[in-house]
Amino acid sequence: MRSSIITLVLLLSIGVSWAGDRNRIIALGVRNFTYTPKEGKETVGSALGSIASVLITGQNTTQQPQYKDAVRAAIVRGLTSGFRTIATDMGNIGEQTNATFDYYVDATINNISTTTKTESTTTTKNGVNTYYKAMVGITLQFKDSQTEEVIASPMFKISDVDVAWIETEESAITSTLRKLSAYVGRYCNRKYPIYGTILESARQSKDKQKEVYIDLGTNLGAYKGLHLTAYTVKTIAGKETKIQVGKLKIMDVQGEDISFCKIQSGGKEIKNILDKGETIFVKSTE
């Protein structure tokens, strides 16, 4: 009995350490942004074609470099919105500062543009309504702060099919940049997920686990509706092996480090593992 208790305590201690190490905050230093729009060489033919397109469709697309600082701010917001990422805007500098970062983030902006269209109307004095869409395309480079090695180069593109027509240019830009921040934040959450463990059973049937409590909550940004995978961890020859056993969904965040979850798959196996007193880990998937 004493041996079993010691073993259980050791397993729980390993679980807390394992999850805690993986939930460390990632510090990002946002550095250099370059604006390099992809513009083809204009010929007489292409110019005439553009004019014809405007006349036929009533739409015209224009690069808007004056919004590049707004794009930068949107990216910083997105990077900071991740579960485990905090971004500091270092300005357009190349040298290191006294601050310590895990990674630097540089970016290339290849598109900041708006498309306008006009429609005839009887509700305005000039008989025309103008509407706007804003598009943006960027590539981020995550670089090791010690070696400058590029470890990831995600691309984000918001095209005209991703946004709706809006009545002012500024509102169109704001809407698109809000979407850009969300895309960047989602990328960070997938790259740097949060980890936890199942605390205890909440509800079960004869042979299947239905609901559980986990040790993730508001302190790491867990929210109602967040999906997670559940798995066990074994160490073989000094290497971790993860075995997925099910999927969970947070139904209610009940505190800084506790949430109530519904088991969506793997209920039978999860119950068997919990009945043995073994630790089950969880990881966010979105």
Question: What does each of the following model-derived ranges do?
Answer:
Residues 4-14:
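Sec-dependent N-terminal signal peptides
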Residues 89, 153-157, 248:
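Short hydrophobic alpha-helix segments
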Residues 218-248:
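Ser/Thr/Gly-rich low-complexity blocks that favor extended beta-strand/coil architectures
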Residues 23-34, 86-141:
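A short, hydrophobic beta-strand-centered structural micro-motif
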Residues 18-83, 194-211, 283-286:
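A structural "domain/chain start" motif
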Residues 61-73, 130-133, 167-178, 219-222:
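Soluble non-cytosolic domains of exported or imported proteins
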Residues 20-22, 145-216, 220, 224, ...:
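C-terminal/domain-edge helix-coil "capping" segments
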Residues 103, 190-194, 239-246:
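Short coil-to-beta-strand transition motifs
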